[in-house]
Swiss-Prot record:
<feature type="binding site">
    <location>
        <begin position="126"/>
        <end position="132"/>
    </location>
    <ligand>
        <name>substrate</name>
    </ligand>
</feature>
<feature type="binding site">
    <location>
        <begin position="109"/>
        <end position="110"/>
    </location>
    <ligand>
        <name>substrate</name>
    </ligand>
</feature>
<feature type="binding site">
    <location>
        <position position="138"/>
    </location>
    <ligand>
        <name>substrate</name>
    </ligand>
</feature>
<dbReference type="InterPro" id="IPR005269">
    <property type="entry name" value="LOG"/>
</dbReference>
<feature type="binding site">
    <location>
        <position position="91"/>
    </location>
    <ligand>
        <name>substrate</name>
    </ligand>
</feature>
<dbReference type="Pfam" id="PF03641">
    <property type="entry name" value="Lysine_decarbox"/>
</dbReference>
<keyword id="KW-0203">Cytokinin biosynthesis</keyword>
<dbReference type="GO" id="GO:0005829">
    <property type="term" value="C:cytosol"/>
</dbReference>
<keyword id="KW-0378">Hydrolase</keyword>
<comment type="similarity">
    <text>Belongs to the LOG family.</text>
</comment>
<keyword id="KW-0614">Plasmid</keyword>
<dbReference type="GO" id="GO:0009691">
    <property type="term" value="P:cytokinin biosynthetic process"/>
</dbReference>
<comment type="function">
    <text>Catalyzes the hydrolytic removal of ribose 5'-monophosphate from nitrogen N6-modified adenosines, the final step of bioactive cytokinin synthesis.</text>
</comment>
<protein>
    <recommendedName>
        <fullName>Cytokinin riboside 5'-monophosphate phosphoribohydrolase</fullName>
        <ecNumber>3.2.2.n1</ecNumber>
    </recommendedName>
</protein>
<dbReference type="InterPro" id="IPR031100">
    <property type="entry name" value="LOG_fam"/>
</dbReference>
<dbReference type="GO" id="GO:0102682">
    <property type="term" value="F:cytokinin riboside 5'-monophosphate phosphoribohydrolase activity"/>
</dbReference>
Length: 198
């Protein structure tokens, strides 16, 4: 990924290309109950049906594994990116993917996931998911890309995070332009439509 900032006027003037790949951030744990797994499964199927390539963190556990398996079972193309240290953990890496990129560390993982995706969607997850989303949002703020950044706020999962964003904006730490880059969707259909919006 070219990490040289572009002028903000250039980024804002760029038309978004029709996405061919979507990078999805989500938890390496399943979460409480079945609703999160069902959401990840639905997203995987929707991405495959939409003829989009799924890029994700390369694990076979938690929501990540559910997401990938659903896309694969629906005939989709799935690309995983995982740090080499994780490959030593039994059952961590998903070896049934279309492609699995093994990189040196977490920094390379995030950079390659960002480079390979034309859009970003965050499903429920923990601190790693939040970090990944905020990193690509920050890169958008800095003019490094013009890719849509979507929070899938199913069942108000991200309400506390959105409250933080609003509070930081009110207190002058997040600009209105950056706040507007956070695309909030309530369901899978809305998220897919959002990343395809010009």
């Amino acid at each position: 990924m070219n990490l040289r900032p572009m002028p903000a006027t250039t980024v804002s003037a760029q038309a978004r290309p029709t996405p061919k790949s979507v990078t999805v951030f989500c938890g390496a744990m399943p979460g409480r109950g079945t609703k999160y797994g069902q959401l990840a499964e639905g997203m995987g199927r929707a991405i495959a049906r939409s003829k989009l390539r799924l890029v994700y963190g390369g694990a076979r556990v938690g929501l990540m594994g559910t997401l990938a398996n659903a896309a694969l079972d629906s005939g989709g193309t799935v690309v995983g990116v995982i740090p080499e240290s994780f490959t030593a953990i039994p059952e961590a890496a998903h070896h049934g993917l279309t492609e699995l990129h093994v990189v040196h560390d977490m920094h390379q993982r995030k950079a390659l996931m960002a480079e390979l995706g034309d859009a970003f969607i965050a499903l429920p997850g923990g601190v790693g998911t939040a970090e990944e989303f905020f990193e690509v949002l920050t890169w958008s703020h800095l003019g490094l890309h013009n890719k849509p950044c979507v929070l899938l706020n199913d069942n108000e999962y991200y309400r506390p995070l959105l409250s933080y964003i609003e509070h930081a904006a009110v207190e002058g730490f997040i600009t209105p332009a950056t706040r507007s880059r956070v695309i909030v969707c309530k369901d899978i259909e809305g998220a897919i439509a959002a990343i395809r919006s010009p």
